Amino acid sequence: MIYGVGIDIINIKRVEHILSKNKQSFVKRVLSEHEQALFANKGDSAAYCAKRFAAKEAFAKALGTGIGKIISFQDLTVRNNENGKPNFFLSEKLRLYLVNKNIKQAHLSLSDEKFNTVAFVILETED
């Protein structure tokens, strides 16, 4: 059964602008340690950050909490499997919160084109 659906879209140029002004603070606030390590080697760093930002915002919308009180950007890490499919890896705090809500699965789809990145998340319960 679907618990929630979230979608987020962000303009990559907006992220480029933010990175040009406040790269360190933005990267530290939005990206997990794992993502920060990969970010250092990315050629298109704005697109990489935009995808992670949009994915985390969409997750928070699907959960119905937004980013802030219940979860932070640091509670979510987006990693791609060997085929390139993006998946969420959760902090222990967030994992326990989802268990309490009976949420068993998070589905993530990311897409981008020249100017925008979009993320779509579905959270499922077992019921």
From Swiss-Prot:
Keywords: Cytoplasm, Fatty acid biosynthesis, Fatty acid metabolism, Lipid biosynthesis, Lipid metabolism, Magnesium, Metal-binding, Transferase. Its cofactor is Mg(2+). The keyword rRNA processing does not apply. One of its GO terms (biological process) is fatty acid biosynthetic process. SUPFAM superfamilies: 4'-phosphopantetheinyl transferase. One of its GO terms (cellular component) is cytoplasm. Pfam families: ACPS. It catalyses: apo-[ACP] + CoA = holo-[ACP] + adenosine 3',5'-bisphosphate + H(+). It comes from the Bacteria. InterPro entries: 4-PPantetheinyl_Trfase_dom, 4-PPantetheinyl_Trfase_dom_sf, ACPS, Ppantetheine-prot_Trfase_dom. Mg(2+) binds at residues 8, 57. It is an enzyme of class 2 (transferase). The keyword Ribonucleoprotein does not apply. Its EC number is 2.7.8.7. GO terms for molecular function: holo-[acyl-carrier-protein] synthase activity; magnesium ion binding. It is found in: Cytoplasm. Belongs to the P-Pant transferase superfamily. AcpS family. HAMAP family: AcpS. Transfers the 4'-phosphopantetheine moiety from coenzyme A to a Ser of acyl-carrier-protein. This is Holo-[acyl-carrier-protein] synthase. The lineage of its organism: Bacteria, Pseudomonadati, Pseudomonadota, Gammaproteobacteria, Candidatus Pseudothioglobaceae. The gene is acpS.
